């Protein structure tokens, strides 16, 4: 018998993973899912996660098959110096992998299958009309359903968040778009690369031997001015950067706006925001989903601690402790990525200083060690 009930609104990656992991704690989980599954499987984005986060979800999600994830032991960083592309820093792991890359749609399909066989996770495909933070219920038409904890994980923006944050957040509109595509090739591309170009950072994320995803963050004006030829420009850029003779195919070209949004308020009473709604960061550093996974891990640990002590989830210390624990790292990462993006912007006034720093950064091994540790396990407070 499951005495305590958790409601998760949203069936994206964050919502699905949270449902499975929290469902291990002998509670009832109701997962409110989208009625339109077509949109989920049109998500052609690719995500990178750290070694420690990979081990965590592999063990907790019981992922027996390894072919969902492409391991990378190395990531190479380049910057555009006038008309030259210079490799200024490389991160490499010998005994373990630096990161794992997967396609969102493939992992979502797997998570859906896992949830279907879980007796304590119920999928409800109904539209939520309202959420009452004070009394802890959701409204489905005239019906009210009460929960011990309500988790909102409905993407970067949702009207459901408004009753919690009241517009309080650290925000920035970059006036940029992330241009994503899937590239098929016949070359040997096994590891990730990040190119800091004058138009904006471009990432290469392989997810199998003959395919990789690219994410190019570009100015909105540049995109609009070159919209008709953007595919040709992207292909020519990739061929030149990777020194390819040709590519076999480019597909699934999509674009989405880039914003910084760091919530300053995470919860109200027993309602919590989780996932992109809590923190949306620049895709340049690939840390967004790592933060989400560390959030889920912390929430699970706090719930487990409360249940072990025989405490109720409702009106407990859990959400306050979660906020105090996770907000510092989430904000530091978000603002740090923002500063990194500003540093690599094409600015002629700061270019001489930037050039000097990047030409000498390889000498400072401690920077690499610290960066590697933080990107893998986060900032430990």
Language model regions located:
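Short beta-strand to alpha-helix junction loop
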Residues: 48-51, 92-113, 224-230, 258, ...
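Conserved FAD-binding catalytic core of PHBH/FMO-like flavoproteins
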Residues: 154-244, 253
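N-terminal FAD cofactor-binding segment of flavoenzymes
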Residues: 41-79
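FAD/FMN-dependent oxidoreductases across multiple families
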Residues: 226-309, 313-317
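C-terminal helical "tail/cap" subdomain of flavin- and related membrane-associated enzymes
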Residues: 2, 301-381
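Conserved N-terminal helical subregion
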Residues: 70-163, 172-176
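N-terminal Rossmann-fold NAD(P) dinucleotide-binding loop
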Residues: 15-16
């Amino acid at each position: 018998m499951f005495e305590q009930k958790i409601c998760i609104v949203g069936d994206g990656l964050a919502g699905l993973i949270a449902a499975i992991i929290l469902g291990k704690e002998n509670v009832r989980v109701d997962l409110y899912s989208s009625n339109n599954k077509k949109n989920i499987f049109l998500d052609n984005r690719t995500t990178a996660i750290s070694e420690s986060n990979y081990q965590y979800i592999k063990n907790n999600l019981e992922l027996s098959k390894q072919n969902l994830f492409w391991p990378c032991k190395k990531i190479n960083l380049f910057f555009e110096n006038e008309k030259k592309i210079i490799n200024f820093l490389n991160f490499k792991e010998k005994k373990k992998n630096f990161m794992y890359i997967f396609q969102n749609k493939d992992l979502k399909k797997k998570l859906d299958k896992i949830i279907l066989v879980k007796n304590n996770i119920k999928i409800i495909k109904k539209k939520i009309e309202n959420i009452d933070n004070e009394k802890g219920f959701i409204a489905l038409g005239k019906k009210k359903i009460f929960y011990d904890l309500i988790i909102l994980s409905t993407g970067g923006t949702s009207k459901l968040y408004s009753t919690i944050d009241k517009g309080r957040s650290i925000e920035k509109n970059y006036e940029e778009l992330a241009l994503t595509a899937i590239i098929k090739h016949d070359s040997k591309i096994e590891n990730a690369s990040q190119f800091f170009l004058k138009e904006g950072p471009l990432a290469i994320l392989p997810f199998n031997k003959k395919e990789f995803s690219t994410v190019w963050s570009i100015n909105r004006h540049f995109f609009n001015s070159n919209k008709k030829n953007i595919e040709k420009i992207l292909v020519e850029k990739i061929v030149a950067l990777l020194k390819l003779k040709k590519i076999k195919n480019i597909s699934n070209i999509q674009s989405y706006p880039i914003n910084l949004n760091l919530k300053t308020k995470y919860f109200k009473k027993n309602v919590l925001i989780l996932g992109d709604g809590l923190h949306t960061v620049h895709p340049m550093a690939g840390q967004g989903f790592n933060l989400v996974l560390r959030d889920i891990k912390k929430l699970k640990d706090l719930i487990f601690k409360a249940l072990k002590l025989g405490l109720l989830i409702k009106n407990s210390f859990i959400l306050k402790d979660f906020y105090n624990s996770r907000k510092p790292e989430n904000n530091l990462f978000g603002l740090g990525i923002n500063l990194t993006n500003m540093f690599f912007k094409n600015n002629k006034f700061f270019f001489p200083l930037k050039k000097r720093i990047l030409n000498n950064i390889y000498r400072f091994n401690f920077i690499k060690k610290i960066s590697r540790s933080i990107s893998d396990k986060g900032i430990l407070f």
